Amino acid sequence: MKICLVDETGAGDGALSVLAARWGLEHDENNPMALVLTTAHLELRKRDEPKLGGIFVDFVGGAMAHRRKFGGGRGEAVAKAVGIKGDYLPDVVDATAGLGRDAFVLASVGCRVRMLERNPVVAALLDDGLARGYADPEIGPWLQERLQLIHASSLTALTDITPRPQVVYLDPMFPHKQKSALVKKEMRVFQSLVGPDLDADGLLAPARQLATKRVVVKRPDYAPPLADIATPNAVVTKGHRFDIYTGTALVE
């Protein structure tokens, strides 16, 4: 994949070249999207809109730390939707990981989560965020146990993941009605890179085959159900709904 690669560390140690080789990225000086290695982290920038700033994955500080400490925890809609109750903490495959926010929330309340991300740039951002998270003395020990990244397309990987998870979580990119400033900023940068998930409808069937209990699909409130398959079961919040579908039970 072609993207503008920028090293701002001043270290001259070739770290960016190693990273590019690992994720199959090719430097393109004229690409409007830039992957930038700073002294603090790896970030994505939209070069023709510098005011939007950089997007990076941060599990340790910022919004994610606030959500972990002061958010709803088990009471969060995503936690309710995957079925967390009492001692039951399902094993989850997040098949559209994105920036890893929902996966992190589930991991922080105790679920083991395997994140799938097919876009190599997004996977590189996630991997960078995970590395910093794993190294953190406070969250590192449990994060290493509960949150991992698999760089693969969900459309192919969903058929051969083992062991099978109890829950598959899907949050396909859907064209957003622009509301909050944050959504505007992140989505403009993000959608410039990955665009909408035009093949997302194809995820529902393999997800239901893989999950032993349920599939949860996050949708904006104005979006039709995935693959136009309606379900009466959903957790509804302001602006979103989490549609719940049955999985395929394990055969003893």
Curated annotation (Swiss-Prot):
A GO CC term attached to the entry: cytoplasm
Binding site for S-adenosyl-L-methionine: 101-102, 117-118, 153-154, 171
Domain of life according to the entry: Bacteria
InterPro entries with a match to the protein in the record: 16SrRNA_methylTrfase_J (IPR007536), SAM-dependent_MTases_sf (IPR029063)
Function: Specifically methylates the guanosine in position 1516 of 16S rRNA.
Pfam families (UniProt xref): SAM_MT (PF04445)
Catalytic reaction(s) noted: guanosine(1516) in 16S rRNA + S-adenosyl-L-methionine = N(2)-methylguanosine(1516) in 16S rRNA + S-adenosyl-L-homocysteine + H(+)
GO MF entries: rRNA (guanine-N2-)-methyltransferase activity
Compartments, as annotated in UniProt: Cytoplasm
Disulfide bridge partners, by residue number: none
Cross-referenced Gene3D superfamilies: Vaccinia Virus protein VP39, YhiQ-like domain
Keywords for the protein's UniProt record, in alphabetical order: Cytoplasm, Methyltransferase, rRNA processing, S-adenosyl-L-methionine, Transferase
Designated gene of the protein: rsmJ
Family according to the record: Belongs to the methyltransferase superfamily. RsmJ family.
Lineage: Bacteria, Pseudomonadati, Pseudomonadota, Gammaproteobacteria, Enterobacterales
Protein name as catalogued: Ribosomal RNA small subunit methyltransferase J
EC number: 2.1.1.242
Main enzyme class: transferase
